[in-house]
Regions:
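C-terminal "closing" transmembrane helix and its immediate cytosolic amphipathic cap
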Residues: 1-12, 75, 297-358
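Solvent-exposed interhelical
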Residues: 162-191, 224-234, 309
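Interfacial loop-to-helix transition and helix-capping segments at the boundaries
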Residues: 16-21, 47-59, 147-160, 199-216, ...
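Membrane-interface helix-loop-helix regions
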Residues: 91, 95-162, 166, 262, ...
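Alpha-helical transmembrane segments of multi-pass integral membrane proteins
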Residues: 242-334
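Functionally critical transmembrane alpha-helices in membrane proteins and complexes, commonly lining
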Residues: 16-74, 91-93, 289-294
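Structural signal for the C-terminal ends of transmembrane alpha-helices
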Residues: 70-77, 103-109, 170-179, 196-200, ...
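Juxtamembrane transmembrane-helix termini
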Residues: 2-8, 58-89, 93-116, 296, ...
Length: 358
């Protein structure tokens, strides 16, 4: 009698070199632009699903994918190499974006409507470059009298992303981090409990925001650590969809939506057709789309594009951001990532675990 084959789990099904995560991240970056189009275009509140905007869903997906990939990176690499790669992935692209915004985009707007000055531009770049202090949103008065007076309201998530990187980096110093995967699952359960308490007590602010994003990040981490036990199949994906729909209906996406979102991102990455999986495999524009989307939308608003309606405004922004994202990848991000093996940290690796280049 034939014995049914066990369901395929995440570890054997997820191919680190042939998956659709980059394509999914690109879609998520575009969804952030679409979501922001309502507020930046002056059309009112952003569309929501339950208690989360479309942009919030996208950011949650980003953090879940990062949790999966970055945890794998930390398990493979010593601390120095891990920190160096994380630095290269975030800061070169960010710093050039800040410079382009402060010394190209803002002066262009300033030439037409005034309000730009060199001290303001230097303050904007210097304050935001470390991603440590509270962020400066304006450069003089160049984006005053617009619906959202900020040059880049998307950058706030990077501080939380970096904090997650630091936590994983520190956890990697413990031998139990490698030998005891339940610690990751326990961390996810604990932070979910914290989010529940914060929601019940109606607590608001930076702590709540970080707790929610950390829960998505740790959901991805937990799927990585238990990848040899968790099935990655259509029936389980269907269950995840049902659970996610339930969180939307009950307005608890930010409390209980992390795990289904993380699972669905991974499952979708494995079932995409071959051509779709290739999107972003060589040229990953997702980060550039994310960090340049907001300033591009501000330029479009100042040019009067919001008169075309929210969806057209969003579509124009998605197209207009592509040259910025392409230049960011080709001229900044990709050259920076080629430096990941330079220096004394290059070549030192631990046993391989699932994950794409991170």
């Amino acid at each position: 009698m034939d014995i049914a084959a066990p369901p395929k789990t995440i570890t054997p099904r997820f191919d680190p070199r042939d998956n659709g995560l980059n394509a999914i991240r690109l879609v998520l970056a575009f969804l952030v632009i679409v979501s922001h189009s309502w507020s930046l275009g002056g059309f009112g509140e952003e569309p929501t699903l339950g208690d989360a905007t479309i942009g919030s869903f996208a950011v949650g997906g980003f953090f879940a994918i990062s949790g999966f990939l970055v945890t794998g990176s930390r398990l493979r690499l010593p601390a120095g190499a891990y920190a160096w790669r994380r630095f290269l992935r975030i800061f070169p692209g960010l710093w050039v974006c800040l410079l382009v915004t402060a010394f190209v985009l803002a002066p262009t707007v300033g030439a037409l409507r005034g309000g730009w000055s060199l001290p303001d531009a230097l303050r904007y770049t210097g304050r935001n470059a470390p991603m440590v202090f509270s962020l400066t949103n304006e450069i003089g008065t160049t984006v005053r009298n617009v619906p959202v007076p900020s040059w880049n309201g998307s950058l706030w998530t990077l501080r939380h992303e970096i904090a997650c990187y630091v936590l994983v980096g520190l956890a990697g110093f413990s031998g139990m981090f490698r030998s005891k995967p339940w610690l990751t699952a326990g961390g996810f359960g604990a932070i979910t409990g914290v989010v529940v308490v914060l929601a019940v007590t109606d607590t608001r602010g930076l702590v709540v925001t970080f707790a929610v994003l950390l829960s998505f990040f740790l959901a991805g981490s937990a799927l990585l650590r238990y990848g040899d036990r968790i099935p990655l199949t259509a029936p389980v994906a269907g269950l995840a969809m049902v659970l996610l729909a339930a969180t939307i209906a009950t307005h608890t996406v930010k409390i209980f939506g992390a795990l289904p979102v993380a699972y669905l991102c991974l499952w979708t990455a494995t079932v995409l057709s071959g051509q779709l999986r290739k999107v972003g495999s060589r040229n990953d524009l997702s980060y550039g789309v994310y960090i340049y989307g907001f300033p591009v939308q501000q330029l479009l608003f100042l040019a009067g594009a919001s008169s075309l309606g929210p969806l057209t405004f969003a579509g124009l922004a998605c197209v207009a951001v592509l040259p910025f994202a392409a230049m960011s990848w080709l001229l900044v991000e990709r050259p920076a990532m080629r430096m990941k093996t330079y220096g004394r940290w290059g070549g030192f690796t631990h046993r391989a675990l699932p994950g794409t280049a991170a």
